[in-house]
Amino acid sequence: MASIELSFIDYPKVTIDSKKELLVKIRDEAGELATQKKIKKGVVDLKVPVLREWIVEVFNGEKKVFNHQLKLENQVVFIKFENIALGDSILWPAYIEEFRKKYKCKVYLKTRYSELFEKSYPNITFLKKGDQLKNVDVQITPLMIIRGAPMLDSPPIVLNLEKGELRPKLDKPTLKRNIEKKYVCIATHSSSYYKYWLRKNGWNDVIKYLKELGYEVLCIDGDDIADYGLVKMHVPNGCIKRTGMRPLSERINDLHFCEFFIGVGSGLAWLAWAMNKPVVMISGFSNEDYEFKTPYRVTNKDVCHGCIRFSYKGKRGDMNDPFYCPEHYGTSRQHECSREITFEMVKEKISKLILSSSHDPQQAADQ
């Protein structure tokens, strides 16, 4: 008699111990074959961290000797993230809540910045550092980025949901306005050099322009200086610097009272988006379908751009290199996607935003 054991921890695994060779098939809930293998003794698995109601079939010749479909209803599902960035932390909870409702399961979530969501998603159990969870039925550690896919597509792919933009709900702290004058929040730093706006004097020109329009400018970057070895990136002068690794409750407070946000593709841009603030996103490394939708995205499409999508299609270069540039590394065109975004391009989007806001009664009421 063959021994067949199932596990859905990390990914579906079928452990076989049989005298005869058996055929193991793993299908998704739609019946699509995900993997199959003939085996006497060992493990058949599908090392893809996605959640499905997996179907496991085992055949002895033509005869089906085992059939099991995972049903997630009332199951304990543990979703854990490791080394997750702020933007990803903000992106996922709304989709996880939709997954919980679709499959009627008990979801436990381990992620950074859980203090942003605990009250807004009371039916998800957020685990703290050191918390232990026993008797887990299903567990995954999702990939943050699915090769070639926009960021907003990753949660639906992993969680088997319809694709679409879901804006999360945030727990808001007690709010207090700290700047009486109208102001704009900016964030100039990012996790890699190639994500910066590298136009010479670009940020200085933006700050000067905003001040001419009557706005104060508040920089909410985590650091004054980002050290990339060969290059140090400084926050611009001429603005109010509320930098430093402050609690996110302070960043939420700053963003709540601002008129709009200007930044690169960073976690603070995602935080502003989650708070329904208009976002001017300056980005050459990504296309408009990669992050959240904003009518105020600034990209120069007359030069090489959107390389974040190239990087998963066999292009050269190491994404761990902060100076990564898959098309033009080591040439005069390196990072032209960022350098060739001019102040005038950014100014045009700022002007469009201000004009739009002045004609939007709902947005005015939200301030």
Language model regions located:
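Catalytic machinery of carbohydrate-active enzymes
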Residues: M1-Q367
